[in-house]
């Protein structure tokens, strides 16, 4: 007769058979908490997987009626990168930075205004309210002078155009008058020629 096994021996025998290696994440509570804080790196697919029955039905419909055309997308939905466009002859594309304004070398007014407005953020670190108000007043005054100068330039341009048109009109008027005088003189000379009697030829016999 075989010797009887004790309960502890039996337990050890069964435990050895079913022993598994568990990760520290599940056994250690601190590691478990760290894992809980990690974000889900791979998002779940939103498209549901269709069942086998639905797939069979879909395939049968395709066999009977043919496959449907897929969804049509517009160009702006496809995120296609813009390619180099063809150059249109005669059209000159603008080059350079957008909104870039060049200042003339002799334009002291604009230069002063720009310098004062650029240094604005550096000057306001340690300045009194009186100094700040004085500086802002200077900037406003320079801007006002710039606006007045622009308006004056517009007026001068308009006046120049008007003078040009007036001179053109006066030249055209004088040429018209000259042509009219010449025409009148020609008509008068023709009338005189018609009125003067034609000389008769005289024949003398000896």
From Swiss-Prot:
Coiled-coil residues: 118-196
GO biological process: intracellular mRNA localization; mRNA transport; ribosomal large subunit biogenesis
Segments of skewed composition (Basic residues): 7-16
Lineage top rank: taxon: Eukaryota
Compartmental location: Nucleus, Nucleolus
GO MF annotation, one: mRNA binding
Primary localization: nucleus
Cellular component GO terms, alphabetical: nucleolus; preribosome, large subunit precursor
Key words of the record: Coiled coil, mRNA transport, Nucleus, Ribosome biogenesis, Transport
InterPro entries cross-referenced by the UniProt entry: Loc1
Keyword Transport listed: yes
Basic and acidic residues composition-biased segments: 144-167
Region (Disordered): 1-25, 144-206
Family: Belongs to the LOC1 family.
Known partners and oligomeric status: Component of the 66S pre-ribosomal particle.
Its biological purpose: Required for efficient assembly and nuclear export of the 60S ribosomal subunit.
Protein name stated in the entry: 60S ribosomal subunit assembly/export protein LOC1
Organism classification: Eukaryota, Fungi, Dikarya, Ascomycota, Saccharomycotina
